[in-house]
C-alpha cells in the first residue's frame, strides 16, 4: 500500500482520475488500506472500484482475514463431515460462476463463466470474492484434517499420493496451468469448465501430491526453501508498478 501511494500519481496518464484526487480522500484511502479496510466505491480514487486503490490485489488478503476469522470462530470447531458438506456447497458456488448458472440472479448482464472478480464492494463482486475464498479454504482445511488422521510411521504425511520428485512435477503442472489461463476464448462454457476443473480437482490434487512428496536432495530442498521465504514478502508488491504501464 505504501509503495502504491508513493507511485500513485505517476499513473496519471493511464488513470486520469488520480490527478483529481483531493488530499483528504487520498489520506483516508491510505489509512483504510494500511488497516486492511475495504474502501467503498464512493472512495475510489483510481477508477477501478477496488478495495484499495493503491494496491488492488489487497482484496485477496482482506478475504483471507475473513477466512481466518471464520476459522477461529466456526470452522475449526466443525467435524470432518460438516466440513465436507460445506465444501460441497461452496463447490456449487464455484460452478455457479464458472458454468454461468447464476442461480441467484446476481449478474443481470449475463453469465460469468469465470471467477475473475472480488475486488469491489458490490453484490456481484462480494459474491465472487466469497466464492473464490470458501471452496479453496474449506477444501484445504478438509485435506489437512483427513491427512492428519491418516498419518502413520510408514506414511508420515498421511497423503495417498506419493511422487518421486513431487516438487518438480507439481511445479511443472502449475507452470502449464498458469501458461494457459483460458481456453476457447476469454469467456464461454469451455473456459468455465476448464477453470472449474482446475479449482475443484487439479489444485487439491497438487496439494495432496505435494504433501505426500519429500525432497531428499539438497538442490530441491534449497529451491523450496528459497521460494517459500520469497513468496509472501513479495506478494502483490509488484502491482503498484503495473499501474504505471
Can you say where each PLM-predicted feature lies in the sequence?
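Hydrophobic transmembrane alpha-helices of multi-pass, membrane-embedded glycosylation machinery
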Residues: 6, 90-92, 142-143
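Aromatic-anchored segments of alpha-helical transmembrane domains
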Residues: 88-102, 172-185
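Juxtamembrane helix-loop transition sites at the ends of transmembrane segments
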Residues: 85, 93, 100, 150-153, ...
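Membrane-interface helix-loop-helix regions
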Residues: 1-65, 94-123, 198-211
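Catalytic glutamate of the conserved HExxH
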Residues: 65, 69-72, 239
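Alpha-helical transmembrane segments in multi-pass integral membrane proteins
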Residues: 39-48, 74-78, 118-245
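A short alpha/beta connector and helix-capping loop motif
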Residues: 79-84
Amino acid at each position: 500500500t505504501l509503495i502504491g501511494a508513493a507511485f500513485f500519481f505517476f499513473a496519471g496518464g493511464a488513470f486520469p482520475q488520480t490527478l483529481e484526487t483531493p488530499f483528504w480522500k487520498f489520506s483516508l484511502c491510505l489509512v483504510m488500506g494500511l488497516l486492511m479496510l475495504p474502501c467503498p466505491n464512493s472512495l475510489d480514487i483510481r477508477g477501478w472500484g477496488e478495495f484499495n486503490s493503491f494496491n488492488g490485489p489487497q482484496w485477496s488478503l482482506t478475504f483471507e482475514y475473513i477466512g481466518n476469522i471464520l476459522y477461529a470462530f466456526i470452522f475449526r470447531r466443525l467435524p470432518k463431515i460438516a466440513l465436507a458438506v460445506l465444501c460441497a456447497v461452496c463447490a456449487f458456488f464455484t460452478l455457479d460462476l464458472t458454468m454461468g448458472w447464476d442461480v441467484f440472479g446476481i449478474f443481470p448482464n449475463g453469465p460469468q463463466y469465470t471467477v475473475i472478480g472480488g475486488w469491489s464492494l458490490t453484490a456481484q463482486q462480494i459474491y465472487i470474492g466469497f466464492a473464490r475464498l470458501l471452496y479453496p479454504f474449506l477444501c484445504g482445511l478438509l485435506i489437512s484434517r483427513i491427512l492428519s488422521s491418516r498419518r502413520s510411521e510408514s506414511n508420515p504425511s498421511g497423503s495417498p499420493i506419493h511422487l518421486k520428485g513431487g516438487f518438480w512435477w507439481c511445479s511443472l503442472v502449475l507452470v502449464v496451468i498458469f501458461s494457459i489461463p483460458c481456453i476457447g476464448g476469454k469467456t464461454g462454457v469451455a473456459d468455465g469448465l476448464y477453470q472449474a476443473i482446475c479449482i475443484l480437482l487439479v489444485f487439491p490434487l497438487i496439494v495432496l501430491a505435494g504433501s505426500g512428496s519429500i525432497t531428499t536432495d539438497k538442490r530441491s530442498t534449497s529451491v523450496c526453501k528459497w521460494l517459500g521465504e520469497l513468496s509472501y514478502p513479495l506478494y502483490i508488491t509488484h502491482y503498484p508498478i503495473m499501474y504505471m504501464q
